Amino acid sequence: MNTIQGIQMIGTQRSGSNLLRVMLDGIREIVAPHPPHILQRFLPLLPKYGDLADRSNFYRLAQDVCELVTVNPVPWEGIAIRTDEVVASCRQQTLYELFRVIYESAARQAGASFWLCKSMKNMLYAEGIESTGIRPYY
């Protein structure tokens, strides 16, 4: 498996999208963990991290994002998100790149060809998501 494809689910509250996410997660080729809402939670906080071109600032952000995934109320079972590995896999020092690497890592660890994120607010961040090279199915 060389290519991992993203799927960004666009749902609304009380629409049944979480049930669909759980059903899709049951397909071996798709990993669809409960969303920790990485972009929604961290984009407003980015100014607190300073210049992300500074490796230490980016690493601190990566640690916090990885911790968010780790303490997500619904665990990502069988998936280990390690800050050092995530940072080493990043091609850019951006929050969007952390998002990409974390979801692709989850897919690799699950042996899946697709990852699915059901974070509803991500539709507002499509341009940033796609700036990493991700061309998700919506």
Give a label for each model feature.
Residues T3-G6:
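Pre-Walker A (Motif I) flank of P-loop NTPase domains
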Residues M9:
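Hydrophobic anchor at the beta1->P-loop junction of P-loop NTPases
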Residues T12:
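Short, aromatic/basic-rich helix-turn unit that serves as a nucleic-acid recognition element
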Residues S15:
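ATP-binding Walker
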Residues N18-I30:
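A conserved segment at the C-terminal end of the G1
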Residues E29-H34, R135-Y138:
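Short hydrophobic/aromatic-enriched beta-strand-loop microsegments
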Residues P33-C117, K121-M123:
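PAPS-dependent sulfation machinery
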Residues K118-K121, Y125-Y138:
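Conserved phosphate-donor/acceptor-positioning beta-strand/loop module used by diverse small-molecule
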